[in-house]
Amino acid sequence: MEGSYWWLSLLALLAWGANGESTSPAETSPAPTTPNPPVVNPSLRRKIVNQRILSAMGMDSDPSNEALNGVCQSIHSNGCNANELKLRLADFFIDTNSSQCYDEILVKKPCSSLTPAHNSHWVPRGLDKSEVDKIFDTKLKLFFSQSRKVTCLSASALNPSQFVKHFQVKIQETSGPAKQSLRSLHCVNLVWSHSHKGEKEVVHVLQSAVPVKLKNCLAMLNFRQCYYNQQSEGPVVVPSYQHNGEKWVTGAYTMTVEVDKHADGPCEISTTCITEGSEIKPGVHSLRGFKTTLVIHGKRNTGRRLLSSSNARQECSSGTFLGEGGSAQVVGPKNDGPGDHITFCNGSVVTKIRLGQEHGCYTVRRIKTYRNCRPEEGSSACEVDDELKPCGAQKCMNVHLSVKGLVKTSRGSNVQVHSCDKDCLIQIPEGFGDIQIDCPGGTQHYLESNVLDVDCPMYNRLGGLMLYFCRMSHRPRTCLALFIWLGAGYGITCIAGYMVYYAILALSMLTRCLKRKYMVKGDFCLKCEQKCVTSLDQTLHDESCSYNICPYCGNRLPEEGLRRHVPSCPKRKQRLEEIDLYLDYLLVPCPLHFALSTAVKLGTLLKRLSWVTVFLCLFLTAIAPVQGQVTTSPVLPSNQSTECTLLPPPVFLIFSAVLMSKTLKRMGPVNKVGAAGHSARRTNSPKNLYKSKQIANTKSGPREPRRRVVVKALLILTASSALQSIHLAQAFDSGSLPEGAWEEEMQLVQGCNQECSLEEDECSCPDGQSMTRKLLFFKGLNSAASKMASSHRLLTSVSIDTPWGAIKVESTYKPRLASSNIQLAWNSIEEQGDKVILSGKSTSIIKLEEKTGMQWSLGSESAAEEKRLLVSILDYTQVYSSTFQYITGDRTVSEWPKATCTGDCPDRCGCSTSSCLYKSWPHSRNWRCNPTWCWGVGTGCTCCGVDILRPFNKYFVTKWTTEYVRTDVLVCVELTDQERHCDVVEAGSQFVIGPVRVVVSDPQNVQTKLPSEILTIQKLEGNQVVDIMHATSIVSAKNACKLQSCTHGSPGDMQILHTDNLIQHSHDGGLNLADLNPLVNSTWMSWEGCDLDYYCTTGSWPSCTYTGINSENTESFDNLLNTESNLCERFHFHSKRISASGSTLQMDLKGRPNSGGGELSVLVDVKGLELHSKKISLKGLSFKTLSCSGCYACSSGLSCTVEVRIERPDEFTVHLRSVSPDIAVAEGSIIARRMTGGPLSRLRAFAVRKVKKICFEIVEKSYCKDCKNEDTTKCIEVELQPPKDILLEHKGTIIKRQNETCVSGLQCWTESASSFVSGVGSFFRNYLGSITLGIVLTLLPVAVVLLFFCYGDKLFKLCSCFRCCRGLSRGKVRKELDEDELRNKLKKFSKEGELFGKEKKDARTIALLLSGKGKNYKELV
């Protein structure tokens, strides 16, 4: 019974293995080792051996069953002996000979004698399948039993020296928290890795002898040479082996844990938290600890779960993600380096001194590293809400990601990177132009605001009054200032004159008061016995009283009579006042004298002259013509004369959203296909995709004579094909990039090629295929808002010549380009009946600018109708081939010492990288450099090493070599609203529309290109998570280090040549072969001019020092950014996305220079174009239908459907214009037909403000003599919606513009003045009712101005009752005067009684003003 029970157990084990991770028998079974082995299932045989091996590793129970031993021995002879397996297991983990491999029972054999087993069912974490196939079942083993499956690598494949002698831990118990979180963890034996925040947590266990128990956790346990997953509750089992009678275990390991979603509670890690106890020796502490449980709470699921959602959890959304973390490894003789070190000895003490196994210790080194993460396939969705959300005082974009990731926003040269946790609000970047959003995984969105920037001051206020000023002049603010100055300018001038005058007067009086305050008073006169008031009075007494002369009246008196006369002299008061007045004048500086004198004499003249000057300046500025940059160089035959300039991109940029030729009219079966496909893309439901395919097959079959090409809604979901958290042999592989913005633009125009024609909202192609492609346009703003976030549109129409002339996107008043039509000269003009047949050619050059173009007028003086041919450039980009050179950054380097008491130093001082610098000093032991236990003198060795501790602090930089490949241009040619062809011009293209043939050359004369070497830079400030894809800036690389040629400390002295080096020490995602790949260990570091040395400290090992080493070179990169050219300011990059593949980085580099992008040569060849001549008389020209809908002051504008009837001829080309000045309509051609039931014409209009009625008239109505005005003019009532604050997905817009330019200076000024007068007349007519009333009302302020001019001084005398500046207090200041001049004046003063002569009348007036006795300003002027 026992035997049968044992066989039942084996059969159960076999049944379990059939469902486990295993290889097929034919693929993995080795050759039998006995001549006649029993017939045993190879899978069962493998499980028997594996269980015995796991038992030898201490990871499973030993199946000590005699019958099992008998079966195993019958298969492998004595190979199943437990002791033999333990010996072979030790060799498996110890022997580092790379030529040694191992068979099924771990017998060591040369690799040449063993063939790796092919495995198609299992790939261990961290290893690429191609690498697995090379070593599977020879150096890579999968040991599995009923309880666990363990993957191990032999030391011949991986030798990280992680096994250490096992010691029983002696811990002194202490108190501590029973439960704690990882972020509050402070234990010597446990380290939480600060990595990218997610559902997984990484914990490094530094002392494996301390038991760890898991509960409700999903854990991956990485022991460097082995790893296994643990899902059940229980202790962590550490791999071990027996060698020389001692047990060896992994010293440190890494746990990557997350909450088991099927469990009831959080994940709990129960262990002993060890802390430093009492100090036994200097720097050596005993172990002290307490039982604790680390609690990890999982993220609670909110909302419902879709059936189609994947069970796999994912932690990141981009394959180029790098999260900062850490790693821990046991230090051996060949794997030391910089970083924090901690040493455990004999299971009882802990220290930071590096000690090895010879001391019964092992040292663990903590390393700064980055971890890579790969998203699940098809789960990296990125969407942007069309409607803006309030965030504080601003509006923000709402971005949705499937998981947390980095989102880059850019607008012009303003680039920002934001960390987004599934849903986040991002402020709209400052600047002008479209908003580009780069999502994780490479998805791109181009957005623009729906609210159109009508740069007319206060256009939506004052009842639209300001729009008239914007119509009068290209500079509406100047025009507004002109009219304000005309009405109130003179009053403003007068008020300004008063203010200036009284300011000068107040300053003068303040100066006089301050000087008087500190002026020395006069002395007592001994002759006349009178107190002198001032120093000037003192001088007068000295000069007069000495000669017995009265100082005031000048009479000579006896000495006694002088004393009686002077106090009662009748002229004393008058003379003192005169002296005081003169002194006031002298105390004021000369500049103030001049200013006051000028204000008194020329005040009125200055006021009037100022008013006239300002008026003339404002008037000339208001009517001055604007000057743009001409960007065309027409090349025409000598017998042709044309005027050719380009169209203004500002206007085109305006209508990149306003204008489009087609709007949705019918939502038929094809629309059903688009809607179903759109729904399927949003849900990723195979059922929905199949349903949409069925609809397409049933509705678009062979019955349709033409296939329809439909523009697809582009909702791009980032799809990565790698497994989550898996490091490959070429581990850093992000997968392929999705299509970018430029590829989407190309698809839009290539889907509607020149073999197709536009019919309503579709581009129809005549090959009968069932595949369709639809042009998605607006059908009302509400329907647009629901689709904007996930669709791109090709909008096609002519632009609108706005009568107010003030729509702004980049520059309103000074357009970047001048614009005009080319009047094509004809080689032949033939008249046949009522038709004119034209033939001719024209050649011109269009400089490459975004959203610009050129228009030809196809008409003749003898023709009554005219067609307009538009060749427009939607966009263009320069395509570059980029080659990766190296990765660098502002690295931090650190040193470490190693020493031995006897023997040699470790090879390369224990450094295992190619970037370290080391130096050794043999036989360096002496009493000053020895620890207390080392008595050696002249023995041993000392070495120092220095290496990279942290590769990036503030900057992550990549250097590239670029090569210009080509320039792709998106060109569209349009003749009417139903004849429009688009294509991507690479090697020249030809467009044929009826009798018109347009040939566009290759891009030529490209002047601005990217430098041959560039740097992509990412700033890591405040965010230690790196997404290599998101380069924040691109700069030139003139001052960056060349490849492996650099001085130490310069930008680029560290050069990472293999991308796997970035994750070399990451061990939280399975096995990592990156640190073994010889190509990985190829980082280059410049140590030019650097040297190492050491210094001794008695009683301890020596310490290292260095000279010439820059420990951190952040300042070098700061200086680099200040000196290099910022290419983001000179280029608009459609794509600068970076991906990782094949151990290097790749960059999809496409950009458009802001200027100097080149030019296109355009040949227009017209053969037999038929137009109606002026001999024809139109009959029955009238509107049949007209309808408009949309919003006002928004970029989507109004969509109008119109049908024009005519009785004779059968067809005629007409144009529409708006009667209302607040409505502008496109200038495109419309075909008037006699027959009914034809396609309706569609056009775009724009309303600057809300209106209730729209009126259009036919421009060619003058050719219809019998037509009534009500037939050729149509008015309809409309209900316009206000603009919604939404973002529109980027649109390729075909644009058109007609605006004649002047050819001479006089003509420019004349036309500008005429436009000004016309604008004034429009204001009078539309705002005041009539031009006559406007003139009358305008004359009133003019008359008031003339009244002020002629009688201003008289009018101001009415205000003479107002007085000011009287009774000012006087101060005293001492002033030195010329004595001789003063004596002469005083002598004359004694006789005449005046210090101011007749020629000093202005001085007396100023003195009176300063004393407060003069006239006021109004009386003076």
From Swiss-Prot:
UniProt family annotation: Belongs to the nairovirus envelope glycoprotein family.
Cytoplasmic-side segments: 501-610, 665-708, 1352-1421
Region feature Disordered, mapped onto this chain: 22-42
Annotated Low complexity bias: 22-31
Domain of life: Viruses
Prosegment location in residue numbers: 722-776
Disulfide bonds: C901-C1096, C929-C934
Keywords tagged on the record: Clathrin-mediated endocytosis of virus by host, Cleavage on pair of basic residues, Disulfide bond, Fusion of virus membrane with host endosomal membrane, Fusion of virus membrane with host membrane, Glycoprotein, Host endoplasmic reticulum, Host Golgi apparatus, Host membrane, Host-virus interaction, Membrane, Signal, Transmembrane, Transmembrane helix, Viral attachment to host cell, Viral envelope protein, Viral penetration into host cytoplasm, Virion, Virus endocytosis by host, Virus entry into host cell
InterPro entries in the cross-refs: Gc_C_bunya, Gn_nairovirus, GP38_nairovirus, Hanta_Gc_N
Coiled-coil features, chain-numbered ranges: none
Biological processes annotated in GO: clathrin-dependent endocytosis of virus by host cell; fusion of virus membrane with host endosome membrane; virion attachment to host cell
Sites carrying sugar chains: N97, N346, N639, N1081, N1299
Position of the signal peptide: 1-20
Lumenal topological segments: 21-479, 632-643, 730-1330
Site (Cleavage): L307, S308, L596, S597, S721, A722, L776, F777
Species per Swiss-Prot/TrEMBL record: Hazara virus (isolate JC280)
Keyword Transmembrane helix: yes
Name of the molecule in the record: Envelopment polyprotein
A GO cellular-component term linked to this record: viral envelope
Residue ranges crossing the lipid bilayer per the database entry: 480-500, 611-631, 644-664, 709-729, 1331-1351
Feature type site, description Involved in fusion with the host membrane: W804, W927, W933, W935, W1101, H1215
Gene3D superfamilies named in the record: 1.10.8.1320
